[in-house]
Swiss-Prot record:
Induction record: Expressed in both exponential and stationary phase; expression is considerably higher during stationary phase (at protein level).
Protein name: Protein YacM
């Protein structure tokens, strides 16, 4: 799933 990676990246960036 691409959404899972995007959410993970967003959480790390936050």
């Amino acid at each position: 799933m691409i959404i899972k990676t995007l959410k993970m990246s967003a959480r790390k960036r936050n």
